[in-house]
Amino acid sequence: MMTNIWHTAPVSALSGEITICGDKSMSHRALLLAALAEGQTEIRGFLACADCLATRQALRALGVDIQREKEIVTIRGVGFLGLQPPKAPLNMQNSGTSMRLLAGILAAQRFESVLCGDESLEKRPMQRIITPLVQMGAKIVSHSNFTAPLHISGRPLTGIDYALPLPSAQLKSCLILAGLLADGTTRLHTCGISRDHTERMLPLFGGALEIKKEQIIVTGGQKLHGCVLDIVGDLSAAAFFMVAALIAPRAEVVIRNVGINPTRAAIITLLQKMGGRIELHHQRFWGAEPVADIVVYHSKLRGITVAPEWIANAIDELPIFFIAAACAEGTTFVGNLSELRVKESDRLAAMAQNLQTLGVACDVGADFIHIYGRSDRQFLPARVNSFGDHRIAMSLAVAGVRAAGELLIDDGAVAAVSMPQFRDFAAAIGMNVGEKDAKNCHD
């Protein structure tokens, strides 16, 4: 039940600097690879959000020793087949990454397990991982329409030659992990760009994989060893404050230590194509990942047409991109959005409804949206709905900097799924985002 409401107020300027939280995708993968490694791994910059804590809790239930002291998470790995049978179903909460990646590991174990989640997660499509895992020899029983709960009877797997039907990093990573635990060689034929954190991180644990054009080759039977990892700042999290700075008057914001992996950086390119002044300073590498300090200035934006090849690379940032589009002069068109309908919510429908509530004209189809932007945009004061989706909640909070009055956001606290520090970061640059109990709010 929704028990809180966020409220926002417009701003006359934004300024300041923040060091953004650790990357969520990398935090998941670091925990999973560390658990499969032999020896101890130390992770610095781990993102302790609800999604990543679901992965941590599941690994603990599988017998992995995970400790946190100040800013360092220590994992004592158990090797490929050292996980222990869980005593109860493993609850992945709202985390699709946790469920899909862990399924690839559990399919190769020698015990039975069940992966479940909240109402939202148990509606999300799982056939994309079930089909190839079954081809590898897995036994997985799902709910109707290939959704969770997933009942997994672990057994030896065999490598396969498989063409990925969509550019999904979760699917790709699930099969890389399963391939490591399988007999023989797994060849994955990719289609389009998806984030490559698993491929970059695996060699840091001593793992090997061969990457050719549109092909990833994984050989089973390797051994991983513990290491020390620094998690870069989360670009998806930084995107909210980038857009806030672009659309707020008299804004100059610095965001430190942001990962700028080219398979994640489409949001930067798209905002720059709209006319956004975004500068990358002090570019360097943390381990295998490129990092920069990002400086963003208020800019007059213009509408653009987003080419289909950008969508997979920017899928998580599209809700906040829609807010930028509403403040851009002219029409923005985004197509190829079928995947946006099967995220934590139907993000296409949810964002369209909220934009219309805020006074933004938009046309929505099965997999596209036209947003009719205005450079003098002032969002209408209104009560809007996060639909229980963290990225929608934070996108609406950013819209508050350009509203004509107060915005009320139902269930804003769902932001903790990926960024529990959102309101702290917002306050640090001058945004006004508060919280009140729902029973004290009225339409």
UniProtKB/Swiss-Prot annotation:
It comes from Dichelobacter nodosus (Bacteroides nodosus). This is 3-phosphoshikimate 1-carboxyvinyltransferase. It is found in: Cytoplasm. CDD domains: EPSP_synthase (cd01556). Pathway: Metabolic intermediate biosynthesis; chorismate biosynthesis; chorismate from D-erythrose 4-phosphate and phosphoenolpyruvate: step 6/7. It catalyses: 3-phosphoshikimate + phosphoenolpyruvate = 5-O-(1-carboxyvinyl)-3-phosphoshikimate + phosphate. 3-phosphoshikimate binds at residues 24-25, 29, 168, 170, 316, 343. Phosphoenolpyruvate binds at residues 24, 96, 124, 170, 347, 391. It is an enzyme of class 2 (transferase). GO terms for cellular component: cytoplasm. Its main location: cytoplasm. GO terms for molecular function: 3-phosphoshikimate 1-carboxyvinyltransferase activity. Catalyzes the transfer of the enolpyruvyl moiety of phosphoenolpyruvate (PEP) to the 5-hydroxyl of shikimate-3-phosphate (S3P) to produce enolpyruvyl shikimate-3-phosphate and inorganic phosphate. Keywords: Amino-acid biosynthesis, Aromatic amino acid biosynthesis, Cytoplasm, Transferase. The active site is at residue 316. Belongs to the EPSP synthase family. It comes from the Bacteria. One of its GO terms (biological process) is amino acid biosynthetic process. The lineage of its organism: Bacteria, Pseudomonadati, Pseudomonadota, Gammaproteobacteria, Cardiobacteriales. Pfam families: EPSP_synthase (PF00275). HAMAP family: EPSP_synth (MF_00210). Gene3D superfamilies: Enolpyruvate transferase domain. Monomer. Its EC number is 2.5.1.19.
